[in-house]
């Protein structure tokens, strides 16, 4: 991947770090001069990805979440990575309303939210090894 700037952030999978992570990514994205709506989209998608790591990847145990962000032209690509339990069936997990946490009244909309607010979404996962969520947002009208 070619890029003109990049950042990497590692933090513990604690819920209080979710807002920190989205703020850091939003600050990094600011160099592209996004609209308020574009920044809100990025922050929402990052929040969902980080929350998925905390709740599903590490199942509320402490692990490391890594965020990498890359800028190329008018595009920001964000990777949210955990080394948690992984996803057995990515296609099923990405279906709206699918949740493995019925007892916790989870909405099952995390991936749907990410897809809605970002222009591209890719998920790579290996059960027992972890998950990588790659999201891309084009800033401005040109994709």
Curated annotation (Swiss-Prot):
Entry keyword annotation includes Translocase: no
InterPro entries reported for this sequence: Anti-sigma-factor_SerPK, Anti-sigma_F, HATPase_C_sf
Keyword Cell inner membrane tagged: no
Catalytic activity: L-seryl-[protein] + ATP = O-phospho-L-seryl-[protein] + ADP + H(+); L-threonyl-[protein] + ATP = O-phospho-L-threonyl-[protein] + ADP + H(+)
EC number from the UniProt entry: 2.7.11.1
PANTHER family: ANTI-SIGMA-F FACTOR RSBW, ANTI-SIGMA-F FACTOR RSBW-RELATED
NCBIfam families tied to this protein: spIIAB (TIGR01925)
Recorded family membership: Belongs to the anti-sigma-factor family.
Protein name: Anti-sigma F factor
Organism: Thermoanaerobacter pseudethanolicus (strain ATCC 33223 / 39E)
Gene: spoIIAB
């Amino acid at each position: 991947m070619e890029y003109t700037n990049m950042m990497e952030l590692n933090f513990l999978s604690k819920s209080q770090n979710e807002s920190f992570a989205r703020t850091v990514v939003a600050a990094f994205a600011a160099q592209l001069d996004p609209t308020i709506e574009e920044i809100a989209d990025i922050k929402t998608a990052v929040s969902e990805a980080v929350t998925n790591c905390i709740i599903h990847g590490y199942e509320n145990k402490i692990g490391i979440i890594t965020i990498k962000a890359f800028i190329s032209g008018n595009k920001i690509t964000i990777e949210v990575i955990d080394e948690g339990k992984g996803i057995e069936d990515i296609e099923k997990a990405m279906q709206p309303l699918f949740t493995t946490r019925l007892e916790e009244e989870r909405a099952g909309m995390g991936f749907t939210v990410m897809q809605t607010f970002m222009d591209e979404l890719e998920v790579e996962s290996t059960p027992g090894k972890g998950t990588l969520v790659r999201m891309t947002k084009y800033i401005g009208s040109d994709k």
